Amino acid sequence: MGTSQTEAWRVTARQTIHALYQLLAQRPDQTAALLDIRDVLLQVYRKLETSKRPEIWVNRLINYIRNAAIKDHIYFPKEQEALMLVLGEIGQKAGFNGQYRADFSDKSQFYSLTETMPRH
């Protein structure tokens, strides 16, 4: 995996996260779970700027979103689902170890000890 490929994933991921965040912000049903997903999207968007392995953050992000969607019965329309599929493709580049290193349901995995985690 070359630097140019990593940079391409970073750019695509940031654009996709931005678009998904905007669509979720427009939804009328702003539940606590949906607000948590938006918080995590914003946090990963920020982390991608400096991360050496953006695909790992995207993998964690998509696993968190899928887990929250199942747990809280969140339905994503086609446009939002298509954006998550793009993120899923980038996240697959993290390899198998990326899936076993995090609790998918825990929002705190996206925040360092010095960062304040929003609670809803």
Positions of PLM-derived features:
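Short terminal alpha-helical segments
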Residues: 1-44, 107-120
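Generic structural concept
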Residues: 14, 38, 42-45, 62-66, ...
